[in-house]
Design a protein with these regions (language model features):
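Short beta-strand-loop/turn "lid" adjacent to the catalytic site in phosphate-handling enzymes
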Residues: 50-97
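Glycine-rich phosphate-binding loop plus the immediately following alpha-helix
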Residues: 17-20, 31-46, 103, 109-136, ...
Length: 322
């Protein structure tokens, strides 16, 4: 019998639900990957009952797709839920692991963030353990950066995690700007941002408003989304491409700051939606002097986080629901 795990993930951007079917018996083996879109309005909804229902129903649908021919070999499902709010001592996720377990007849690991907090962690980022499992090796130093809605990093030296933290906004401000101007859900390849100009004065103001955040930390999305409201007057006077260009540079600066904090390691590996933003990656490569690559040679960047939660379920680092 195979020992398979299903990992699910909907990030802070809420753009889709990703899932993968994996095995850890002889290193990581990815058997299947799928993505489902959410119903209209999910991305910006404040209705927790709607969010609860949607993430639960879509998760059941996605699990059933992934395990169609392997159901008897699945040990557990990793369901992190949809983060509603997060701070260092409590995390709130939407979704029902109990219903998923009952409907699929498969045990579900969930409440990963509060489990981590209860065991001395900050509840985020949770992916460093998977970074270590996947990428650490003797005689190397690597910085692994996940650019999701929020950007987080893991600094690996030899086979150890030296440091990990949330470090700044990833795609969240870019996606919000696109929505606010009715330009779509995201800026494909950073094409619109690449046509804009950086507002240096505004960039320095944005940096000053979040410069006091310490490492290590776990950031709630509201920390960065509040920048839009705080600086509304300045944004009202600017073209969307200039706002996008300036927000892109904000992400670049926060990545550079953490890169320097970690001692400027020679190798930097990226994954997450931001790694597919050509303009953002172009600016990162111009700013950071390191060997830069993406994780895609090991696993598709899009499914790293869902595989990471499957790994945490495999290691039993969550609450089990049957």
């Amino acid at each position: 019998m195979k020992n398979l795990y299903v990992g699910l993930m909907s990030g802070t951007s809420r753009d889709s639900l990703d899932g993968c079917l994996v095995s850890f018996e002889k290193g990581l083996s990815v058997l299947a990957c799928e993505t489902l879109s959410f119903s209209e309005g999910y991305q910006t909804s404040q209705d927790q009952a709607f969010i609860d229902r949607e993430i639960t129903i879509k998760s059941i649908e996605l699990v059933n797709k992934l395990i169609e021919t392997e159901r008897q070999n699945v040990v557990a499902i990793a369901f992190p839920g949809q983060t509603i709010s997060h701070n260092d001592d409590f995390s709130l996720q939407a979704g029902s692991p109990e219903i998923i377990a009952k409907q699929t007849k498969i045990p579900v690991y969930s409440d990963f963030r509060n489990f981590d907090i209860a065991n001395g962690g900050k509840g985020a980022p949770l992916i460093p353990a998977f970074h270590k499992y996947l990428l650490s090796e003797k005689g190397t130093e690597k910085l692994v950066l996940n650019i999701g809605g929020i950007c987080n990093g893991t600094y690996l030296k030899d086979e150890n995690i030296v440091h990990s933290s949330d470090i700044g906004p990833g795609n969240c401000l870019l996606d919000a700007t696109m929505r606010n101007f009715n330009l779509g859900k995201f800026d494909l390849d950073g094409a619109l941002a690449s046509k804009g100009n950086i507002d240096s004065f505004l960039l320095e103001e944005l940096l000053s408003q979040i410069e006091s955040l310490p490492y290590p930390r776990a950031d709630d999305l509201s920390v960065y989304m509040s920048l839009i409201e705080k600086n509304k007057k300045a944004f009202d006077e600017k073209a969307p491409e200039d706002i996008l260009c300036t927000f892109t540079e904000l992400t670049v600066k926060k990545i550079q700051e953490y890169f320097n904090f970690c001692g400027a390691p020679e190798t930097v590996v990226f994954h997450g939606g931001g790694a597919e933003n050509k303009y953002l990656m172009h600016r990162i490569k111009e700013t950071i002097k390191a060997e830069i690559s993406t994780i895609d040679s090991v696993i598709s960047s899009k499914y790293v986080e869902s595989a990471a939660f499957a790994y945490l379920a495999f290691k039993e680092r969550a609450v089990l629901f049957k």
